[in-house]
């Protein structure tokens, strides 16, 4: 067993034939993959393809309709708090920031040493006394991601880190994710719409189309076949040009 929950060859998280959705109605169908320690998997696709729905199921926030999820010995029906105890950190689309607290107190209330986050994002050092509500969107995301990574999770789920942020900030965030995988052995599953940037940091890419696997590629193959990956987005809508429910 490695420090981050898998064997030397085995996965940290294993997903088999996962179907999940809302009110008993499947949105995601028959999804299967493994993620090993130190590996970054990127789930790609347009709005409504089922990416966030998948993440909610992996975190234990949505029920599995069929299939299995195994993470650190915890099955797919375990809620988020039990998974967190086993080393899961989940960065959602909504940045989890206490707006009335300083950046420093936002970290301390989460049990994180601010210095560990400064090591990841040195630009935050001069902002430690600033209230969360006065931080820029990029600074808030650095706070949220830094807090998650400072806990040295076995598994990081990161949903749309790049949402609404400048390209340079997105690079800083994705570099921190890659560093955590490489140096700490964190297994990472991240959701992104913007393939070009995300694929620079990815070992494995899955394009979800209408709730199903459209493409399943190594990171290297996905980078070589970027036009095909992007074409998969364009064919992930219904006949009226609208995405399926997320």
Predicted regions mapped to residue ranges:
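Conserved ABC ATPase signature
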Residues: 131-135, 139
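Helix-to-loop junction immediately C-terminal to a conserved catalytic motif
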Residues: 59
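Conserved ABC transporter NBD signature motif
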Residues: 66-77, 86, 114-115, 119, ...
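ABC ATPase NBD coupling module
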Residues: 63, 75-95, 126-129, 222-229
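ABC ATPase C-loop
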Residues: 148-149
């Amino acid at each position: 067993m490695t420090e981050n929950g898998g064997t030397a060859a085995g996965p940290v998280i294993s997903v088999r034939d996962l179907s999940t959705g809302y009110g008993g109605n499947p949105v995601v169908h028959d999804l299967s993959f493994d993620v090993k320690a130190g590996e970054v998997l990127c789930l790609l696709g347009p709005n409504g393809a089922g990416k966030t729905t998948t993440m909610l199921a992996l975190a234990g926030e949505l029920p599995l309709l069929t299939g299995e999820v195994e993470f650190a010995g915890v099955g797919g029906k375990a809620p988020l708090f039990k998974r967190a105890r086993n080393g899961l950190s989940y960065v959602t689309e909504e940045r989890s920031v206490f707006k009335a607290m300083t950046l420093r107190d936002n970290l301390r209330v989460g049990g994180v040493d601010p210095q560990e986050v400064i090591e990841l994002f040195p630009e935050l050092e001069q902002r430690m006394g600033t209230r969360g509500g006065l931080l820029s969107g990029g600074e808030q995301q650095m706070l949220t991601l830094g807090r998650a990574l400072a806990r040295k999770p076995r598994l990081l789920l990161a949903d749309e880190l790049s949402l609404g942020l400048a390209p340079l900030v997105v690079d800083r965030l994705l570099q921190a994710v890659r560093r955590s995988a490489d140096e700490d052995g964190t297994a990472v599953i991240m959701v992104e719409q913007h393939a070009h940037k995300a694929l620079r940091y990815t070992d494995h890419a899955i394009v979800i189309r209408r709730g199903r696997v459209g493409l399943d590629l190594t990171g290297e193959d996905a980078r070589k076949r970027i036009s095909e990956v992007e074409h998969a987005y364009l064919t992930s809508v219904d006949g009226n040009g609208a995405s399926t429910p997320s």
